[in-house]
Amino acid sequence: MMMMTRKYILFLLFLSIPVVMTAQDKDFGIWYGISAEHKLTKKLEIDLLTNVRTFRNASKLDEAFIEGGITYSMYKHISIAGSYRLTKSIENNDSYYFRHKYMLDLKGNIPAGNFNFSGYLRFQTAVKTYIKDENDKFPSYTGKIKLKAIYKTPTFPLNPYIYIETFCPMFSAKSGTIEKNRFSAGVELSITRHNSAEVEYIFQRDYQPHISDINIISINYKLKF
């Protein structure tokens, strides 16, 4: 088990090293998030979160959203979730418009000693209210995969983690390509049994319409009740 754990961590670390390419654009942003989750029953949980994201060297608002969802635990380590996100984001005309996003997840987690490995497969659809051309009138579909490894420090409230995320367009001319990747390393601070905070660094590479990179500092506060 320990050997498999080490191999898995090395695999994630390898994937978290961005491929060296010449990006046409490089940027920096800061993300701020607050989330809350509440167990309704042993198998049913509701979640609510809000997030504000900046770009252009953290000088301009990129998007802000609020999201609500529900998770059902089918088995001990497998669950399904559905959520809705209302976003106000900047568009090509430098003005802000609403977007509606609907998400369906299949989640899993595997504990291994002080480590916990988790991930999910997501199918999501987004609907724009900013219509620039004919394609904007129709929903866009995206598949997403996330893999995460966290080490639960036994005697200290700081838990380091890494994760990767990949986004792929679906049901379009761009199907079979990668839209963007995220590689992240961070630390979780356990404040109390029901409160925690996270600080993480994210490297995001967008491939469409051209290669562009953004370095992100993400700060999150989490509440469980």
Where in this protein do the model-derived segments appear?
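Bacterial Sec-dependent N-terminal signal peptides
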Residues: M1-F28, F225
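Residues that define the transmembrane beta-barrel architecture of outer-membrane proteins
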Residues: F28-I30, D62-A64, F98-Y102, K137-G143, ...
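Repeated loop/turn-to-beta-strand initiation elements of outer-membrane beta-barrel proteins
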Residues: K43-L48, H77-G82, G113-F117, T155-N159, ...
